[in-house]
Amino acid sequence: MLLNKKSLDCISAFASSDPTRYMLQGVHIEASGNMIATDGHILGILTPGDSLEEKDFPSIGQSAGDVPALVPCTLAIDGIKALSRAIPTKSRMPIVKHALLDHTATNANGKAVFHVTDLENPQVVNVAKLDGTFPNYVAVMPKDPTVYRIVFDAELLKRVATAALTLGKDQKETAIELEFTASGLSAMKATTTNKDGQTLTAVVMPLRGSRPREEYGLLVPAIIEDTVTT
């Protein structure tokens, strides 16, 4: 299994920093390569890409032979962050900008064993496994049919969230209310009010062009039609 810095940094943002929530202070890795993290309020699931193959990773001491399936495990968030820092970022070879998870060695003990190298300085990074059962995150996944789909530029959403946090910087938490039209093809209105009564209203245009128009908006008619025909 190959993991790069972007994926590790991305999923780490969802882990808990609360010392009383032991099993949430880590990243759960499944045999499929999916990485899951949650703090109990927000859940992140990162699905691996398939652009690179493990067999092309430089041989630097990883276990030989057939690669067994990974036994799912939860890795301590501090170790995940240390692993991210160890991954080379300046190599011209894309595969070197990854850490290779040694399935055989990881399955055999209480730590995950990763190999990283810049082709001159190979090293092994061990990340402690958390002893316990990761929450059943599948139970909180939405199961009802999707009735609405709309896409926004992540940078625009970040600007709205940053502005809202600036307005409510002295508050324990800042809420943003989102309003959509019935079609979902027009702008979204985001509103936040701070404790001083100041209100910010932001209007965010949807991202267009990345998918066919018919894939966006209210999907209820299609669902009703499927229900009737079946």
Language-model segment annotations:
Residues 1-230:
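DNA polymerase processivity clamps
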